[in-house]
Amino acid sequence: PDGSMKASSRVAPVAGETLERIDALLSRLGNPVGVSAYKPYHSSGEDFLHSFLGMIGIPIELTPQFREDAPVVFLNESARFDPTIVARIDKQLRAGKSIVITTGLLKALQGKGIEQIVDLEVSDRRVLTRSFSNLWGGVWEADRDILLPQVRYATNDSWEEITALAAEN
């Protein structure tokens, strides 16, 4: 009757007030930095992996452009849709920068030139485990079993940072 609007939801005004308070702090946070993650347009493979990494606290900057200026680029299986991805990986590494790839991408690039860059191969074997070690400082246990692909490599040419332990090894 007095012409004033009544909030139709108690959630929206509270959220608005909270966001206004946060706005006052944003200028003091600095420049957030995340790991550049390249996902070409219209690509798929290992879907939602970037989101899962973000949920465990790894800041991901997902982009459809391959960031040559990034010190580290994360690539999952979706990068296979870029026909120049092996050349991009090679160029990035030769520039002294780091590339992190998943076993999904490694398997997708087998026979397409990746073997000229790294002497690793994803086999068809899997291991179901919950035990892990860094080989130098103990064993850690996950809450549940995790199914992992086996990656073959020549010992002393490559070393894993973390190894999965099973009864067979």
Model-found features: residue ranges?
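Hydrophobic beta-strand segments of well-ordered beta-sheets in folded domains
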Residues: 1, 32-37, 71-75, 95-100
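Hydrophobic targeting/anchoring helices
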Residues: 1-59, 163
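Short secondary-structure capping/turn micro-motifs that flank functional sites
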Residues: 4, 68-70, 108-109
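Short low-complexity, flexible loop/linker segments enriched in glycine and/or proline
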Residues: 6-17, 72-78, 113-118
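Generic structural signal for beta-strand residues in well-ordered domains
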Residues: 28-30, 66, 92
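A short, well-structured beta->alpha microelement
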Residues: 49-71, 77-80
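A conserved amphipathic helix/loop scaffold
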Residues: 64, 76-169
